[in-house]
């Protein structure tokens, strides 16, 4: 119990960072017996649902929208973290769904060629990104998995789990692919491996516009926050911002509402000004 006190618990633990925080997603606990899916493989965002987690994703969507409206060329977002199990894939798929519901054309790329967690959402198809990067015999259009309910939401899975993921990502065909996709989509989210394990996220990030860094409450040790601040100050990742995931909601209140919940303009924008 004592060592749990060293973990990030909520927004208060991030107050000393100058890294902007885009949003806070409350802990999602699924009824596993009911749907036979782990919490990591569930789409919780629904068009007319007004529960706490859907409201949290709407706030996050508004904040991402505000960023993009300031620079319409910014449409490729890398999602990474320090730890495995931070909920990157869960966030990537649900943020994407929140934009698809608004009628935006959205793509999620599974950039974790080692585990393919996003791919599990769409049945882990045998053909995907690794096959394209390795051979380029396939058109990227053939890799797309289209959502059954929202035809404007697509996923590119990993496909074959390769023995040499880093080498594949360093191939020039990745840059060519992302450039082509920019012309087709409003938003592109790339789920990447944690940065402390392999170099893959840094390789992919050079083709992206912004980095969403997932901090999982109850998982990330507070001692790593200074490292996150260093990464931000040294600009090792472009336009880094935090998404806090898995916070405990208290007393039925919207625990993620901290300062900018009623509109990005009133909160996040002024938050950025304060940090300058």
Task: Say what each PLM segment does.
Residues 197-218:
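Inter-motif core of Ras-like GTPase G domains
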Residues 130-180:
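Conserved Walker-type P-loop NTP-binding/catalytic site
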Residues 64, 158-199, 205:
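Phosphate-binding/switch loop-helix module in NTP-utilizing enzymes
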Residues 1-105, 111-119, 124-130, 141, ...:
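Short boundary/hinge segments that flank catalytic cores
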Residues 187, 210-213, 241:
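Well-ordered beta-strand positions
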Residues 89, 110, 191, 209:
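Conserved G/P- and acidic residue-centered "switch" motifs that form tight phosphate/ATP-binding loops
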Residues 74-78, 153-155, 187-189:
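Residue-level preference for the first positions of well-ordered beta-strands
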């Amino acid at each position: 119990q004592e060592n749990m006190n060293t973990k990030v618990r909520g927004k208060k633990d991030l107050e000393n960072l100058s890294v902007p925080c885009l949003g806070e997603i409350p802990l999602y606990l699924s009824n596993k017996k009911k749907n036979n899916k782990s919490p990591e493989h569930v789409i919780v965002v629904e068009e007319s649902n007004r529960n706490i987690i859907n409201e949290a994703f709407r706030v996050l969507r508004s904040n991402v929208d505000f960023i993009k409206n300031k620079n319409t060329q910014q449409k490729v977002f890398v999602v990474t973290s320090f730890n495995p199990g931070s909920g990157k894939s869960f966030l990537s798929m649900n943020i994407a769904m929140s934009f698809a519901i608004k009628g935006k054309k959205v793509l999620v790329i599974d950039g974790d060629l080692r585990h393919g967690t996003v791919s599990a959402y769409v049945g882990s198809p045998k053909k995907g990104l690794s096959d394209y990067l390795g051979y380029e015999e396939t058109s990227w259009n053939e890799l797309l998995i289209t959502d059954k309910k929202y035809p404007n939401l697509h996923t590119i899975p990993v496909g074959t789990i390769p023995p040499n993921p880093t080498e594949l990502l360093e191939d020039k065909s990745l840059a060519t692919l992302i450039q082509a996709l920019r012309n087709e989509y409003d938003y592109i989210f790339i789920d990447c491996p944690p940065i402390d394990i392999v170099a893959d996220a840094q390789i992919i990030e050079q083709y992206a516009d912004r980095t969403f860094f997932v901090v999982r409450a109850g998982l990330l040790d507070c001692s790593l926050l200074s490292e996150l601040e260093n990464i931000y100050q040294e600009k090792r990742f472009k336009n880094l911002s935090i998404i806090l995931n898995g916070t405990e909601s208290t007393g039925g209140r919207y625990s993620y509402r901290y300062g900018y919940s009623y509109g990005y303009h009133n909160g996040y924008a002024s938050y950025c000004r304060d940090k300058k």
